Amino acid sequence: MELAQAIAEAINSNGQLIAEAGTGTGKTFAYLVPALLAGGKVVISTGTKNLQDQLFQRDLPTVRDALKVPVSIALLKGRSNYVCHYHLERAQTEGTFKTRDDIRHLGKITKYTQMTQSGDKSGLSDVPENAPIWMQVTSTRENCLGQECPQHKECFVLKARKEAMEADVIVVNH
């Protein structure tokens, strides 16, 4: 409770706060409650993608619902975490596969892309995050075609960025 009050005071006074607390002490709720009650834009940066997903999928909705505050929440990851329609299509037609797993994984990614709204590869647990096929079906800053891309309008990265711009709370990782 003391941590939540200190965080609320720091937010209200536009101040800074450095705080430390042990595992299982409720740090997440201690900062979420005052942040959501304060209104305005909030960016939460986590140290891991697992914690980022936990905040987005579980903790934030729980706190938002308990407080009954109408805040929108967006998840924003680096571009290598999203399937690229253009590179997926290229992999399907021109891909070089070193193993049968690559071919099997490509099929699963293709099906997933047809069903997902986000294109976030963490939503497809059937394909390991370190599977080599991901390098063929995601983009980098260097190989992204941007507005020249024939799949530009369906781009999962741009969709995630647009949702983040419109959201009250954005969950990122560093």
Task: Name each model-derived stretch.
Residues 1-19:
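Conserved pre-motif I regulatory segment
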Residues 8-9, 28-41, 58-62:
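Walker A/P-loop NTP-binding motif
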